[in-house]
Amino acid sequence: MAEPFFSVIVPAHNAADRIRKGLNSIKRQTFTDYELIVVCDDCQDKTAEIAHEYTQIVWEVGWHSCGRTRNKGLDLAEGQWILFMDDDDWWIEENAFQMIHDAILDGGEDFDVLAFGFHFGERGDAFQYHGKHYIAIWNKAWKREFLERIGARFPDVPHSDDVGFAEYTHPKARFRYLMAVLYDYNYMRPGSITHKLKTGELKRLEEMGLR
């Protein structure tokens, strides 16, 4: 069987109350040459059961580590390019994957990462991403061959594993940009660890002058 063009990796933790919106946004994509990988980390609810409604690639672990969970997704991935989605985020456009696919093909072979715009879900500000310095992994398509060649892995830390990943990958990567807002970053989910972490990421973004 030919490898899919995209592997979409979704790490999840007790996400039964929110994950459907993101999974539905993937299911609605007009471009269908992708595999969906959901890695459930210590889920005590029906997250895995819901994930099985959308994909056969559901892996359950008990690590309490988003970094290790994402690494498991990378281990399972067979796609040419990697996309990440948090369990409380979603894709805005139904043709998002098609737009990313077309931009990759138009770009030739001289880049490793395609970055695109994202939207802050609750604040209501559309933030157009123009540079490579924001640490997020979910507003980028990553060439799997590149990640494997440089041995890119997420650190096993309690939170902000994307910081270490960005510090390792960004200096080695060749970037290309798609000027379209495709991803909704729901950083304001109340009462959650994710909410606190994502608010911290917003502060780092503002400190770097990208906001």
Give names to the regions the model predicted.
Residues 1-209:
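Nucleotide-sugar donor-binding/catalytic module of glycosyltransferases
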